[in-house]
Amino acid sequence: MRGKALKSKLEELVDGIQQRIDFVTATGVSSFEQETEQNYGKLEYLQSKIKKDDGISDWVDEKQRLSGRLNKLEKQVQELEELADEWENYLQLLADTKLRKDNV
């Protein structure tokens, strides 16, 4: 009888320990699953940001392209201003030459 009581007590202890192991395992698995879900959420968020950054990259590329065009236009305007100055000097010389001919 004592053997049965001891065996029963041991079985209770084993059952209690097994329940604790099951609880800790379930809690650990649950925590792991929650953490995994959170990490996937963070990953999706970061991936969406990267996609938005591609839009920013496209915007920067467009601005650089437009800046290049603007620089080219500024050079052309400067060349036209220089050409206009040369024409102005040429016309002034023609006017001076005509005045001299008229005065002679």
UniProtKB/Swiss-Prot annotation:
Q: Which InterPro entries match?
A: BLI1
Residue ranges of coiled coil: 56-99
Show the Pfam families listed in the entry: BLI1
Give the GO cellular component terms, alphabetically: endosome
Q: Where in the cell is it found?
A: Endosome
UniProt keywords (A-Z) are: Coiled coil, Endosome, Transport
State the family it belongs to: Belongs to the BLI1 family.
Describe the function of this protein.
Answer: Component of the biogenesis of lysosome-related organelles complex-1 (BLOC-1) involved in endosomal cargo sorting.
Q: How does it assemble?
A: Component of the biogenesis of lysosome-related organelles complex-1 (BLOC-1).
Q: What is this protein called?
A: Biogenesis of lysosome-related organelles complex 1 subunit BLI1
Naturally occurring in which organism (per UniProt)? Kluyveromyces lactis (strain ATCC 8585 / CBS 2359 / DSM 70799 / NBRC 1267 / NRRL Y-1140 / WM37) (Yeast)
